[in-house]
Curated annotation (Swiss-Prot):
<comment type="similarity">
    <text>Belongs to the PPase family.</text>
</comment>
<keyword id="KW-0479">Metal-binding</keyword>
<keyword id="KW-0963">Cytoplasm</keyword>
<feature type="binding site">
    <location>
        <position position="154"/>
    </location>
    <ligand>
        <name>Mg(2+) 1</name>
    </ligand>
</feature>
<keyword id="KW-0460">Magnesium</keyword>
<feature type="binding site">
    <location>
        <position position="80"/>
    </location>
    <ligand>
        <name>diphosphate</name>
    </ligand>
</feature>
<dbReference type="InterPro" id="IPR008162">
    <property type="entry name" value="Pyrophosphatase"/>
</dbReference>
<feature type="binding site">
    <location>
        <position position="117"/>
    </location>
    <ligand>
        <name>Mg(2+) 1</name>
    </ligand>
</feature>
<dbReference type="GO" id="GO:0005634">
    <property type="term" value="C:nucleus"/>
</dbReference>
<protein>
    <recommendedName>
        <fullName>Inorganic pyrophosphatase</fullName>
        <ecNumber>3.6.1.1</ecNumber>
    </recommendedName>
</protein>
<dbReference type="GO" id="GO:0005829">
    <property type="term" value="C:cytosol"/>
</dbReference>
<comment type="subunit">
    <text>Homodimer.</text>
</comment>
<dbReference type="GO" id="GO:0000287">
    <property type="term" value="F:magnesium ion binding"/>
</dbReference>
<dbReference type="InterPro" id="IPR036649">
    <property type="entry name" value="Pyrophosphatase_sf"/>
</dbReference>
<dbReference type="Pfam" id="PF00719">
    <property type="entry name" value="Pyrophosphatase"/>
</dbReference>
<feature type="binding site">
    <location>
        <position position="122"/>
    </location>
    <ligand>
        <name>Mg(2+) 2</name>
    </ligand>
</feature>
<keyword id="KW-0378">Hydrolase</keyword>
């Protein structure tokens, strides 16, 4: 049984919905308190699932809230859902983030020529099991894509759950194409077109959309972990609304174990209904698989 569990507050598909990660029953920060590396060799990493595969609610670790619960993103006070771009439905992987990482907006990457997007590092977990919001999965890194999102570098790390049946066969990005043909191409297309139904242009990529290999990806992860260390210890100025509060990080600027007791109790509430228009399929010209 995992030492990590979840505490849900409010109903899914409402503004009140929050998912806290707990360790041994005590709320912790989903961004700061979960170790990035799950083993001493740094070959297995922890990821936090934000959005289970095939779902549409844009759930994400909230950088501004105490202990960084996962909430649904909003725009102009309304909940945000990703659109279904044919032939995809929702997110096509378990989508989440690496804890203890930060894409530093003060650093321009020498190869992408763009600064970081000020978020934890995004992760696409490609295993067969659907995850759940707040789940902490142990994964291994396979590769990385560099999305250029409105002038910022937005890395997308490709990983697989170490417990997946295919995990022993997948050790680098070329193994993904061998054993899961079409997935990398579909991933590239998904990120390229997913904003088009909302009236935005298609996204572009560094490296002409190439998915870089495991070694390159592991270096990106290491750099973003170091950027987080600078952030949590006060060596990098955090945005004024970031919450760096944690219960376990030695040397951090905001360590406060007592804060766990202030988190609301769990609530078992049924999901709220969503507008049927959320489920519409959009057909994007020029996006053949």
């Amino acid at each position: 049984m995992s030492e990590y569990t979840t505490r849900e507050v409010g109903a899914l598909n409402t503004l009140d919905y929050q998912v806290y990660v707990e360790k041994n029953g005590t709320p912790i920060s989903s961004w700061h308190d979960i170790p990035l590396y799950a083993n001493a060799e740094k070959t297995i990493l922890n990821m936090v699932v934000e959005i289970p595969r095939w779902t549409q609610a844009k759930l994400e670790i909230t950088k501004e809230a105490t202990l960084n619960p996962i909430k649904q993103d909003t725009k102009k006070g309304k909940l945000r859902f990703v659109r279904n771009c044919f032939p995809h439905h929702g997110y096509i992987w378990n989508y989440g983030a690496f804890p203890q990482t930060y894409e530093d907006p003060n650093v321009v990457h020498p190869e992408t020529k763009a600064k970081g997007d000020s978020d934890p590092l995004d992760v696409c977990e490609i295993g067969e099991a659907r995850g759940y919001t707040g789940q902490v999965k142990q994964v291994k890194v396979l590769g990385v894509m560099a999305l250029l999102d409105e002038g910022e570098t937005d890395w997308k790390v490709i990983v697989i759950d170490v417990n997946d049946p295919l995990a022993p066969k997948l050790n680098d990005i070329e193994d993904v194409e061998r054993h899961m043909p079409g997935l990398i191409r579909a991933t590239n297309e998904w990120f390229r077109i997913y904003k088009i139904p909302d009236g935005k242009p298609e996204n572009s990529f560094a490296f002409s959309g190439e998915c870089k290999n495991r070694k390159y990806a592991e270096e990106v992860v290491r750099e973003c972990n170091e950027a987080w260390e600078r952030l949590i210890t006060g060596k990098t100025d955090a945005k004024s609304d970031f919450s760096l509060v944690n219960v376990s990080v030695t040397g951090s600027v905001a360590n406060d174990p007592s804060v766990s007791s202030t988190i609301p109790p769990a609530q078992e509430l049924a999901p709220a209904p969503v507008d049927p228009s959320v489920h519409k399929w959009f057909y994007i010209s020029g996006s053949p698989l």
